[in-house]
Amino acid sequence: MEGTPKATAEIFEVTKSEVNGALDEKSCGAVVALRLQRAKTGEDALQLLHEIFVRCRDEARTARSRSDDACEKAVHICGNTAASLASVCLVRPGALGKCSQQSRETLASALLGKATSLRPEFLQGALAKVSPELLKDVAKPLVDQCCEELKPATATEIDVDRVCGALNTWLRCAGKKVAGAALIEHEAFQVPPLERPSGGDPQPPDEQDNNFAALLGQAGMAQDQAAQWGAMLRGVQRSVNRGLPLERTCLLGLLLRVSGGASYRNDVPLEAQARGLRELMQRVRRPQDVPSATRELTQRVSVCREAISSLIEGLVRNGPQSRENTLQWLTALLNRSKPGRHAHATPATRLGACAAWLRLCRPFLGDEKKEANAVASLDYLKSDLGKAAYPDDLTCVNVAPMPSSAPMDVDSDQEMYDDDGDAELKAALELSTKPTQDFHFVTRCFFLASRAVTLGVAAELHHTVGMDHRPHRAAAQVGWDHDLTRAMLAEVVAREAALGSESVIDDLQAFSACQCRWLLRLSDDDLRRCPEFLLEDACTIPCELNSMKPDTLRRSKPSPDLLKLCARCLGATDTLVKSPHAREKLGKALYDLFLPVTAKDKTYTEKYMYRQPLQENAGNVELLANASPEIAAKLCPAILWLFGDAEHIGDIYQIADQRLRIAALIKHLWDAPVHRAAFRTIVADVRAFVTFANGLLNETNKLVAGAIERLPEIRNHQVRTGLLDASNDEFRRLRAEYESANDTRREELDSRHSEHEQHL
């Protein structure tokens, strides 16, 4: 091209008369280079090349519309040349002049929405010509800017969505197998070392111990005792939250940390959470504000987690190197999320990781052929990632642990603060960074997702029991305008929004059904050795979801596999499943999920916790009422056995609740013909029937004894309130005491009387 451009401030015009069939790749390069040389101050080469590329594409469409093949070909060459020069800008910043010095930063800003966006086809053309060895240098500014966006405490779901969108665009445009590999080369995608990064130079351990000892000595403690306690306090100071480095220094951890909506914690007092719940406390002032705030926050959390899950899925699908690094990082998070003082990530991080694992499992859930790829054995627990995610001390379903009767001594107190667990954690973490054995991807996803569900959703669902009515009790004491009451309302919104996403609930239900089918495929020996939480989660998660959101059960699919699992595990009495907690969860699942509402009655605990009314699933009710003779033959004796064995299953304080549930099951099954026939054959199992009869008599005796103890208290309160005459001096004293009592004391006496009457 000769002469000056028509408009130096605009992109050159390409017409048929100017081209005349002589425009080739070389001349196109000269044209584009001339435009870059005449770039104004502040203009960036990457943006200029993108404008040229877009204009050439528009001109190519115009030429195609008028069937000008020569012009269309020439313009295509010019556009491709612009994309090729863009790759030069990214590989060698400054190679095309001053305007190309910040091209990598411009690319990162454009992907994050801080600058004019770049078309995917332009990015694909530019990044395709960058070698895999240099692609990681091009990706580094992008990852750095993503981390800077998320590190402030004010980061929101909008920032997460923007970062995930930028990284997903990179994965789509930078090429299969190489895009993810370039990202994970960055230190923000690596598993950090076990030791916590310190903010400054720490004092030597001995000097710090001496500081503690000196303070205790000043308080009057003996020298040797002060030294011992100083060492112990130093151990407490070293016991840091091992999940925090993954949340504060790693990009995936930063994303997951913000994904939970409002920030709440389980291990700190509610008063200390005011900062994280401040926004919700301003929004939610009364119970009627909770539904709308919950819907809004749930939608935000859902969009945020879907974006993170999409990013993790993109990393896993991009290539083997990216997939292995991502799985190892997520496994390290599981390793550091197990309950205990050494490793406990925040609820938002654990729930976000759980949603990501469920997203990875989504393609095979419900597909019988694909689910069969999850090997029906416990061999994966012996692999490197399996050992890192699953502690060696997990309780098995065939184990019935007995509480220790040994008295606590000083050594046991010291064990609470030593750092012996660091060695175990470090060894497991090292395993999580080694290449895994050759297990099918479905097998790996199933086992690791099962652990993520236990540490994430299952752990958090437990905290939702009775949470709806805690603010009402607080308001009765301090009023609705008190910060504590408003913080409780905000916590209700935060917890339900973090757990109540429709997509996550659907994935959880599908995954629980998959767990049931996998457990049914296990041999008896493997089922006995199976970690207890796998069986418990398959039973409790649908129940807890029904408790938190009663509509969940009504709109869910029937659960024939769960019914078969209950019949198999309970039908063998205690020979297959000895764990008392697992047996109690199996019976509770039958009561919560398979009984009609008319057959249920609230237990003592449910009445005390103001539990929402349970719903029913018509499909499940039909499954139980018309069960096969094989299931009925196993289930009926097992339920009688559970009733009589209630003292030995579950929590000792829940014996009455367990028997109420089992009694409702027995009553309902007796009305079904197939189960009544099974009950009539119970005489063949003398041991189960005797256990049931003993349990029935024991429970009756216990209730009668409790009623006899409470009758005098009920009579005394009736005398206090004037329902009965005060016929002697003792009764007159009780009435005078009640009449002279203040309102608080009267409420206490009335409440105790209501509890006694409720017991009767």
PLM features: residue spans?
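Extended alpha-helical scaffold domains
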Residues: E2-L760
